[in-house]
Regions:
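Long, positively charged leader/targeting segments at protein N-termini
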Residues: 2-127, 132-135, 163-600
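Signal peptide-directed extracytoplasmic domains
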Residues: 139-140
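E2/UBC-UEV (E2-variant) core
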Residues: 145-161, 338-341, 349
Length: 600
């Protein structure tokens, strides 16, 4: 098994490697990058900051040209080694093979008929790359002494992958050979391709992802040069930005949670072979068998011989798929647009509204979502908007009135309006909000559709335009839904229709209908909806605090260093707490589901 010449230094065109750069010159550039990435951008200056950070990164990449490690041969040449390695280590020996599916990339193809719910793929723990295997590897000594590696499992996995890639005798080499040499995440976009996302709801996550990655790279470059525990790492003499970008993307597109060996907690892992499966709509069909100590996957549906085998990655939005997985899923039943909403602390009724929201289990400032289907808002967002639009008398009724405790259960139930006027206000707000958000885009939906018809459009440009078009379509549907609901309730008010009243006996209805669950049960599919907005972002939220007068939204996400000292030679250059916070923001959505990985 294996190829004669496994690893080589990357060729840099006809010119080969660049002229040697002095360590001092490189360290000066790295220090400048670290300093730039460790401060928060001023509101509205996020793009300008991105351009500056990218400029520094490109200077570093130019000086590192020719120093990155790649493998001989094509990726496809190594798939037979991957299958043989899996069989040798207790994995499946038949039923599927790795195949090229054109625009979908590589995936798994059935080599026989497979029945729905049939166990067709299993991966023993010894094949997995995990945080535990990293701690037991050459990376262990540095991991035990570095706070960032300890706090961020995804970064630990990235370094584990780099260290094993640099070791020709690594037991995971057949898996590492099978990984793509480049990805389609925004970390690989050209600046003009990222620019296509300006004005979208996704742009801030894209910019933060790049900034966090650059900051981590600069921090660890300095650490590898100065920390005694790094002296034996194979990365010490060659650690390029391209290498780190590749490792981060490999982990970001593939990381999954599995139990530790004792089953006591969940840790991040890379799952060879299984992560070749592409995504489709459906249900989670993968789990971990603690008794047999292996990851197991059953078929999502019946598959005929030669058909592609799909799995369901989870309820991700297309923004999450593009940013964290590098693809756009056209028929995404779970697509949505994130919006940050909050009750202004300067509002006269803030305390009363915050109290009603608190009783319903909803923060006064939170992240919600507008969905691609009907209704466009969740029960939690409906409850928030109802409270936001309440008059003082309505607030008193929900705080002190007869049956106040029971009424909290109705806030997210569309069948029990607070009042016709309240419904008109909240749907008017949704209509206005969606219209304002649509005005922030630089192109129309029709213009985006025309652009997507161009045959010479780059893949990354296509992803960016598909994503911004999908956002607009969700907002357009929300606007139309808001208008229809507003007109409906205006008619109810005009007709003086009787208002449905909640009775204690209605609790059975609330508890037995998935769409009418009491808000306090917090049963939400999307992990990000309803998260409390951190205090450092509340000042920004004041700028777009749901005022019904149509105030335009500001789109910055603050990152604030707290000035805490760092360790070793990196002291004073970067705030570790800020770094941890930034990376958690970019990884939060990828580390919480069983089947969140890339489409090949």
């Amino acid at each position: 098994m294996g190829k004669k010449s496994r690893v080589k230094t990357q060729k840099s065109g006809s010119g080969g490697a660049s002229t040697a750069v002095s360590p001092k010159e490189m360290m000066n550039l790295i220090s400048e990058l670290l300093q730039k990435c460790s401060s928060a951008a001023s509101a509205g200056k996020e793009w300008e900051e991105y351009v500056q950070i990218r400029g520094l990164v490109e200077k570093i990449r130019k000086k590192q040209k020719g120093l990155s490690v790649v493998f001989d041969g094509s990726r496809e040449e190594y798939f037979s080694d991957l299958m043989a390695w899996a069989q040798e280590n207790g994995g499946p020996s038949e039923g599927f093979c790795v195949s090229d599916f054109g625009s979908e990339g590589y995936g798994l193809k059935a080599t026989r008929d497979i029945k729905a719910e049939e166990l067709f793929l299993w991966v023993p723990r010894k094949m997995l790359m995990t945080v535990e295997s990293a701690q037991n590897s050459v990376l262990g000594p540095l991991h035990s002494q570095d706070r960032i590696l300890q706090a961020m499992e995804n970064v630990t996995l990235a370094f584990h992958l780099l260290c094993e890639r640099a070791d020709p005798s690594s037991p995971w080499m057949p898996y590492i050979h099978s990984l793509p040499q480049e990805y389609d995440t925004p970390l690989y976009f050209q600046q003009e391709e990222v620019q296509l996302l300006l004005g979208t709801q996704a742009i801030q996550d894209v910019l933060s992802q790049y900034k966090n990655t650059a900051r981590q790279y600069a921090y660890f470059y300095k650490l590898l040069q100065t920390h005694p525990a790094a002296s034996k790492l194979p990365l010490k003499d060659s650690f390029t930005f391209d290498d780190y970008r590749w490792a981060v993307s490999s982990v970001m597109t593939r990381q999954n949670q599995i139990p530790t060996e004792d089953g006591g907690r969940l840790i991040l892992a890379l799952i060879p072979l299984w992560d070749m499966c592409n995504h489709t709509n459906g249900l989670i069909t993968t789990g971990y068998n603690l008794e047999d100590d292996r990851c197991e996957c059953v078929a999502l549906q019946d598959y005929k011989e030669n058909e592609q085998i799909y799995i369901f990655y989870g309820t991700r939005s297309n923004a999450e798929f593009v940013i964290h997985n590098g693809f756009f899923f056209q028929d995404n039943a779970h697509d949505r647009v994130k919006i940050k909403l909050g009750v202004s602390k300067s509002e006269r009724l803030f305390a009363m509204k915050a109290e009603v929201l608190s009783r319903a289990g909803i923060p006064a400032s939170s992240t919600f979502a507008l969905h691609c289907n009907e209704p466009p808002i969740s029960a939690q967002l409906l409850a928030f908007l109802r409270v936001f639009c309440m008059t003082e008398e309505e607030l008193k009724d929900y705080l002190l009135g007869e049956g106040a405790v029971g009424k909290i259960f109705t806030l997210g139930n569309s069948e029990f309006p607070v009042s016709w006027d309240n419904e008109i206000k909240l749907w008017t707000f949704l209509e206005t909000r969606a219209a304002l958000l649509l005005k922030t885009y630089k192109t129309t939906s029709e213009e985006d559709r025309s652009l997507l018809e161009k045959p010479d459009l780059s893949l990354h440009s296509r992803l960016a335009i598909q994503l911004r078009l999908a956002e607009k379509q969700i907002l357009e549907r929300a606007l139309a839904s808001g208008r229809a609901k507003r007109l409906h309730f205006e008619k109810k008010l005009e007709e003086d229709a009787p208002l449905p009243r909640y009775e204690e006996s209605d609790i059975a209805l609330l508890e037995n209908s998935q769409s009418k669950l009491p808000i306090i049960l917090r049963q939400l599919e999307e992990v990000e909806e309803g998260q409390e907005v951190p205090e450092e972002e509340e000042e920004e939220e004041e700028q777009h605090s749901l005022l019904l007068n149509g105030q335009k939204e500001a789109y910055g996400v603050k990152e604030e260093a707290n000035g805490e000292e760092t360790q070793e030679e990196v002291r004073g250059d970067v705030d570790l707490d800020s770094m941890e916070k930034g990376q958690r923001e970019s990884a939060e959505l990828t580390a919480s589901r069983t089947e969140d990985k890339t489409e090949e």
